[in-house]
Curated annotation (Swiss-Prot):
EC number: 2.4.1.83
GO biological process, alphabetically ordered: dolichol phosphate mannose biosynthetic process; protein O-linked mannosylation; response to ammonium ion
Assigned protein family: Belongs to the glycosyltransferase 2 family.
Protein name, entry field: Dolichol-phosphate mannosyltransferase subunit 1
Domain of life: Eukaryota
UniProt organism field: Arabidopsis thaliana (Mouse-ear cress)
Residues noted as binding Mg(2+) in the record, renumbered to the chain: 106
Binding-site positions, GDP-alpha-D-mannose: 20, 22, 24, 49, 51, 104-106, 133, 220, 226
Residues reported to bind Mn(2+): 106
Subunit record text: Component of the dolichol-phosphate mannose (DPM) synthase complex composed of DPMS1, DPMS2 and DPMS3; in the complex interacts directly with DPMS3.
Source organism phylogeny: Eukaryota, Viridiplantae, Streptophyta, Embryophyta, Tracheophyta
CC cofactor note: Binds 1 divalent metal cation.
Amino acid sequence: MADEMETKGEKKYKYSIIIPTYNERLNIAIIVYLIFKHLRDVDFEIIVVDDGSPDGTQEIVKQLQQLYGEDRILLRARAKKLGLGTAYIHGLKHATGDFVVIMDADLSHHPKYLPSFIKKQLETNASIVTGTRYVKGGGVHGWNLMRKLTSRGANVLAQTLLWPGVSDLTGSFRLYKKSALEDVISSCVSKGYVFQMEMIVRATRKGYHIEEVPITFVDRVFGTSKLGGSEIVEYLKGLVYLLLTT
């Protein structure tokens, strides 16, 4: 589907997929396989930004490089955990695509949606296409009621205070025109999970065209969630900061 749309537009675009990792040894090979499966006719590269995982994630990525090629799988490791926001910035420095996709490594963002992201962008010429759990066709699988209420509440609070123009402000599965991402990311100051929220708010304030694609978010299959109390506090601080500065 994505390849057909590219052909109609004549130009063959390249996509850089940035995947930050920390202790994702059990997931990274699966998500890479699924990306190749769903983007068979698309020109893309996968940039893995690993923050010094002690579980052997980097060794698995190196094996994937031997299988798929170092030109398709790029490992850009860092010595320690430096924050999600800086991981995107680090990956962006090495991206050679016309577009940049950011997604999680834990299989909560299924690569089967990537063709829909690409199709939506090509049809609308949007600067940003973001996945949303909160429109018809979207949803969440694997969360308990408390987690769903917390996520929904955080999103409603942000919507009420910030008016971002998108239905899922706290989502982190997005496609950007590279030039738009470079512009937006240069004005962001957050480093952790609130970075995603800041990027979409800054993009809205700058007037970028944003489209949405419904997705079903699936709770991680292997490993444990890295979202805890400190991230919730960080989110609330970030919300106040954005309210005062945007």
